[in-house]
Amino acid sequence: MQLMKSSYLELTARGHVTDLLKPDDTLEMLETYGFAVTQSPVEAVSTAHAYREIAAIREDFGLGEPYVPLLYRDRDEPTVTAVTRKGGSDHPVFHTGEAQGWHTDGLLEDIGTIKTTLLYCVSPAHRGGRTFLLNAGRVFEELRMEDPEAADVLLRDTILGRRSTIPGVDREAVGPVFLELGDGHYATRYGEGRVERWYPADAAEQHALDRALRFFRARRDDPDVRIDLLLRAGQCLIFRNDVLAHGRENFTDDPQRPRLLLRSLHTNAPKKPS
């Protein structure tokens, strides 16, 4: 990957949508920017067609079968999740139109477990529903240069707990916010939303943590390290969940055609099959 040197500002002129039938172009985008958006060649996309295209993407990039997160293992959840409004659901975000703060997928998983997320848009919202991506590792590297003490707190393996907000599910996973990888990049589980619980060891560490989080809040709206994507019908967002953080703005549905995205999670990183 080249994420530590990449700027999302480069995509203003270049664009970020690739042809579903040109996987080499898509893989180059993923290697450079950590994400890609494929465009279906089909004009009117059905849910059945979306599932077929997701299967083709999995095969093209060696992703393997979808991974079911630990949080949902006992809930009889499908391997590919329908992210849409649904009455009676106990999930605080999936089946509502509410915004979702910065996070990585895999609430209870060890850092870096879920490497790839696919989000396929069958039908967009009437208004809103953008997905945000943050080059979290690059921001962290900047923090290490500016305030090493604050950065070191985010590497501590008991600093961040992520706790389920699903009613009746009292589970939490504790770990670091960042983990150094061998290729000069960082795995991340950065987030600031409803599920995070912070565990600084003492007052000095609390001050360092506060500085680190302020740094991220100041940087995460910069289009150099953040990109906002509004998926259209037939587009599939592929991104490196282990190195990028993501979020979602709230949305309003067309009652006749509500927003529907299909989400597929994978423990493999995209690669060119041998």
Swiss-Prot record:
Q: Which InterPro entries match?
A: AlphaKG_dependent_hydroxylases, TauD-like_sf, TauD/TfdA-like
Q: What biological processes does GO assign it? A: antibiotic biosynthetic process
Q: Which cysteine pairs make disulfide bonds?
A: none
Keyword annotations of the record: Antibiotic biosynthesis, Dioxygenase, Iron, Metal-binding, Oxidoreductase
Amino-acid positions noted as binding Fe cation in the UniProt annotation, renumbered to this chain: H103, D105, H246
Q: What does this protein need as cofactor?
A: Fe(2+)
State whether keyword Cell membrane applies: no
For this protein, the record's SUPFAM superfamilies field holds: Clavaminate synthase-like
- On whether Iron is a keyword of this UniProt record, the answer is yes
By what name is this protein known?
Answer: Uridine-5'-phosphate dioxygenase
Q: Which organism is it from?
A: Streptomyces sp
